[in-house]
Amino acid sequence: MKNILVTRIDDRLIHGQVVTAWIKQYPINKILIIDDELSRNKLMERIYKAAAPVGVEVMIMDQEHAEGFLKEPPLAKEHIMVLVKVPQVLERLLQSGVGFNKIILGGMGAKPGRKTFNKNVSANEDETECFRRIIDSGVEIYYQLVPSEKEVNIRKLLS
């Protein structure tokens, strides 16, 4: 199994907080974005790769390829941040045997059909139930925009 240091749900994927805070907090040298649609968009792939700091490799994979990649043996000094837009992607990985110590919830913006839990997190019923199933499987999910903020267990947001 690959060495995953940070697993984050954030619908903006790579942006200022990820680049300036999370990558500086952890010795991350590889970002794996898991998104089926984005994996087919070569222009956006180039944009995301350009947004990463020097020395940080960005890989964009669909769910199927990411599952296989994450199950491979770790490489020496490979430290991965997994980024996804929605919790369903991580639930599928968990069901396939990929493990996560914890999941950090960043931003999930407001959209039609989503309930707002705080100023940065909104989720529809399917996403909310997915959060509950992940938590019930034994993986905690914490809301935290940047590492300097206190983690908030999302059980509090869901109740």
Where do the protein language model's features map onto the residues?
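Long, hydrophobic N-terminal alpha-helical segment
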Residues: 2-52, 57
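A general structural motif
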Residues: 10-13, 62, 123
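Glycine-rich, aromatic-bearing surface loops/beta-hairpins
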Residues: 96, 101-159
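Short gly/pro/ser/thr-enriched loop/turn and capping motifs at secondary-structure boundaries
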Residues: 39-41, 66-67, 110-113
